[in-house]
């Protein structure tokens, strides 16, 4: 029974999180549902687990702009999974074109 509850949360999170693509075609997180949600995160543990993540204030048009949007609030640009379900912890990776 617990499996169905966890599976439902997973599906709700991936369905709710539509990837944000800018008008010029920049897609920071092209992986789609799994690690496809652009987020600004303040904690980064071992480059995989991030915490205190939130959506960027606007859709970034480039990797540089994505970094600048997140840096304005002291956070790092990341592509995350489960960030809507677990706001204090998400599995993340660096977005396309982001080096730091």
Swiss-Prot record:
One of its GO terms (cellular component) is extracellular region. The keyword Lipoprotein does not apply. Disulfide bonds join 29-79, 40-70, 41-53, 80-92. It is found in: Secreted; Secreted, Cell wall. Keywords: Cell wall, Disulfide bond, Secreted, Signal. Aerial growth, conidiation, and dispersal of filamentous fungi in the environment rely upon a capability of their secreting small amphipathic proteins called hydrophobins (HPBs) with low sequence identity. Class I can self-assemble into an outermost layer of rodlet bundles on aerial cell surfaces, conferring cellular hydrophobicity that supports fungal growth, development and dispersal; whereas Class II form highly ordered films at water-air interfaces through intermolecular interactions but contribute nothing to the rodlet structure. Belongs to the cerato-ulmin hydrophobin family. This is Class II hydrophobin 4. It comes from Gibberella moniliformis. The lineage of its organism: Eukaryota, Fungi, Dikarya, Ascomycota, Pezizomycotina.
């Amino acid at each position: 029974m617990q499996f169905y509850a966890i599976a439902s949360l997973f599906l709700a999170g991936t369905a709710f999180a539509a990837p944000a693509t800018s008008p010029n075609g920049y897609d920071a997180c092209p992986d789609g549902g799994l690690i496809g949600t652009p987020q600004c995160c303040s904690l980064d543990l071992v480059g995989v687990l991030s915490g205190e993540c939130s959506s960027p204030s606007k859709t970034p048009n480039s990797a540089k702009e994505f970094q600048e949007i997140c840096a304005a609030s002291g956070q790092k640009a990341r592509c995350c999974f489960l960030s809507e379900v677990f706001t204090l912890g998400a599995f993340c990776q660096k977005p396309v074109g982001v080096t730091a």
